């Protein structure tokens, strides 16, 4: 899979001076009362935007935000992003707010651009064609530009107009710095890791991570499992799990994976104790189980202290760690300890530490460990599909070197 990482043209392989450059960014940021609450994705886009500006290109930015389902929704307008980008770039980012995205305002704004100017188009998902990858909208986007740059790793696993369709109608399609960085870290971790290589998987469902578990068992030295998905594995081992989250139809699969780990000589670590409660609530009374078994009427909501210690020690011995998914219900303080301990062990480790986006990225940033990690992926779904060994359509569509 290294081919994905290194055989695509990048922004440095082309001349952008005086050219109109359409850049697909990932500005799908959380908003509260019209204010951006997490700027991680904006910061990630800046190197590519600045490079094109400095080289005298005309920068036309596009992105989706939320799920407007093909119609304009004021609360999902990219206006707050344009405002914040103007501040971060020290330059006005023009925002021709066309509900049809590529409307008269946008076309006129692009026509009047000077070298080094930046404009941001309206939310691409205001158009219903976007998620269906329909030719009409792809052609409209392409008509604005000479060059297309994909720098949205977070949507690289989606074949939409603004990620894949547009590449058919623009002569040159390359990747930006953010996608390069993502592929460098994730690609090296999966294909050429420094060993011991450990992967930690958490989150609620086994079904979300089936292919990831299967693929990683071919690559890792140790696989650590926590979070809601661990109870299906504990059940498969023959333990009682009370009223914990269980995917009945995945018990056999969990047994197969336990067997596969043995065959491959991979150390598979599962919880040895749990933090449980009678209800799923912030004020629920937490108990710690003595071993793997959870008694009737109780549900597991976090890994227990013995497990946290076991997992943290394992992390300390690693040279490469990839983590995707929290160890428990980290939004409730009583059930956040497992996630905190694992994050702390990674932050203190000398290893290359990679956080696979989504909830784990949120947890790490919330806990203040963000700057202690080697790389925090900007794409939850995309990084998962990458770890499954799948080709990402948004990257496959770019020009080869």
Swiss-Prot record:
<feature type="binding site">
    <location>
        <position position="41"/>
    </location>
    <ligand>
        <name>substrate</name>
    </ligand>
</feature>
<feature type="binding site">
    <location>
        <begin position="64"/>
        <end position="67"/>
    </location>
    <ligand>
        <name>substrate</name>
    </ligand>
</feature>
<dbReference type="InterPro" id="IPR036043">
    <property type="entry name" value="Phosphoglycerate_kinase_sf"/>
</dbReference>
<keyword id="KW-0547">Nucleotide-binding</keyword>
<dbReference type="InterPro" id="IPR001576">
    <property type="entry name" value="Phosphoglycerate_kinase"/>
</dbReference>
<keyword id="KW-0808">Transferase</keyword>
<feature type="binding site">
    <location>
        <position position="300"/>
    </location>
    <ligand>
        <name>ATP</name>
    </ligand>
</feature>
<dbReference type="GO" id="GO:0043531">
    <property type="term" value="F:ADP binding"/>
</dbReference>
<keyword id="KW-0324">Glycolysis</keyword>
<dbReference type="InterPro" id="IPR015824">
    <property type="entry name" value="Phosphoglycerate_kinase_N"/>
</dbReference>
<keyword id="KW-0067">ATP-binding</keyword>
<comment type="subunit">
    <text>Monomer.</text>
</comment>
<comment type="pathway">
    <text>Carbohydrate degradation; glycolysis; pyruvate from D-glyceraldehyde 3-phosphate: step 2/5.</text>
</comment>
<feature type="binding site">
    <location>
        <position position="209"/>
    </location>
    <ligand>
        <name>ATP</name>
    </ligand>
</feature>
<dbReference type="InterPro" id="IPR015911">
    <property type="entry name" value="Phosphoglycerate_kinase_CS"/>
</dbReference>
<comment type="similarity">
    <text>Belongs to the phosphoglycerate kinase family.</text>
</comment>
<feature type="binding site">
    <location>
        <position position="331"/>
    </location>
    <ligand>
        <name>ATP</name>
    </ligand>
</feature>
<feature type="binding site">
    <location>
        <begin position="357"/>
        <end position="360"/>
    </location>
    <ligand>
        <name>ATP</name>
    </ligand>
</feature>
<feature type="binding site">
    <location>
        <position position="125"/>
    </location>
    <ligand>
        <name>substrate</name>
    </ligand>
</feature>
<dbReference type="GO" id="GO:0005829">
    <property type="term" value="C:cytosol"/>
</dbReference>
<feature type="binding site">
    <location>
        <begin position="26"/>
        <end position="28"/>
    </location>
    <ligand>
        <name>substrate</name>
    </ligand>
</feature>
<dbReference type="GO" id="GO:0006096">
    <property type="term" value="P:glycolytic process"/>
</dbReference>
<dbReference type="GO" id="GO:0006094">
    <property type="term" value="P:gluconeogenesis"/>
</dbReference>
<feature type="binding site">
    <location>
        <position position="158"/>
    </location>
    <ligand>
        <name>substrate</name>
    </ligand>
</feature>
<dbReference type="GO" id="GO:0004618">
    <property type="term" value="F:phosphoglycerate kinase activity"/>
</dbReference>
<dbReference type="GO" id="GO:0005524">
    <property type="term" value="F:ATP binding"/>
</dbReference>
<dbReference type="Pfam" id="PF00162">
    <property type="entry name" value="PGK"/>
</dbReference>
<protein>
    <recommendedName>
        <fullName>Phosphoglycerate kinase</fullName>
        <ecNumber>2.7.2.3</ecNumber>
    </recommendedName>
</protein>
<keyword id="KW-0963">Cytoplasm</keyword>
<keyword id="KW-0418">Kinase</keyword>
């Amino acid at each position: 899979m290294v081919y994905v990482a290194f055989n695509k043209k990048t922004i440095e392989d082309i001349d952008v001076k005086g050219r109109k450059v359409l850049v697909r960014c990932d500005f799908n940021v959380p908003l509260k009362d019209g204010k951006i609450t997490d700027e991680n994705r904006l910061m990630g886009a800046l190197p590519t935007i600045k490079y094109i500006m400095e080289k005298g290109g005309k920068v036309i930015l596009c992105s989706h935000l939320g799920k407007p389902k093909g119609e304009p929704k004021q609360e999902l307008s990219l206006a707050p992003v344009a405002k914040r980008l103007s501040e971060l770039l020290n330059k006005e980012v023009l925002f021709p707010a066309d509900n049809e995205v590529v409307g008269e305002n946008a076309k006129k704004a692009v026509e009047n651009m000077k070298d080094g100017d930046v404009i941001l188009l309206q939310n691409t998902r205001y158009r219903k064609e976007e998620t269906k990858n329909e030719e009409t909208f792809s052609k409209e986007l392409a008509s604005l530009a000479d060059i297309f740059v994909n720098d949205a790793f977070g949507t690289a696993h989606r074949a939409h107009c603004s990620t894949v369709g547009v590449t058919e109608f623009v002569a040159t399609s390359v990747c930006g710095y953010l996608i390069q960085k993502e592929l460098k870290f994730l690609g090296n971790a999966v294909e050429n890791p420094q060993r011991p290589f450990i992967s930690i998987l958490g989150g609620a469902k086994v079904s979300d991570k089936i292919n990831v578990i299967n693929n990683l068992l071919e690559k890792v030295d140790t696989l650590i499992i926590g979070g809601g998905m661990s109870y299906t594995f504990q059940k498969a081992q023959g333990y009682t799990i009370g009223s914990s989250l269980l995917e009945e139809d995945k018990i056999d699969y969990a047994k197969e994976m336990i067997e596969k780990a043995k065959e491959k000589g991979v150390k598979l670590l599962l919880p040895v104790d749990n933090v449980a409660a009678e209800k799923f609530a912030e004020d629920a009374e937490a108990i710690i189980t003595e071993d793997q078994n959870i008694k009737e009427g109780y549900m597991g909501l976090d890994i227990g202290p013995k497990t946290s210690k076991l997992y943290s020690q394992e992390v300390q011995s690693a040279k490469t760690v990839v983590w995707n998914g929290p160890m428990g219900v980290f939004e409730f303080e009583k059930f956040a300890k497992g996630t905190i301990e694992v994050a702390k062990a990674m932050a203190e480790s000398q290893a290359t530490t990679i956080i696979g986006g989504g909830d784990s990225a949120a947890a790490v940033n919330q806990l203040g460990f963000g700057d202690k990690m080697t790389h925090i992926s900007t794409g939850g779904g995309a990084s998962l599909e990458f770890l499954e060994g799948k080709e990402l359509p948004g990257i496959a569509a770019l020009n080869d070197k």
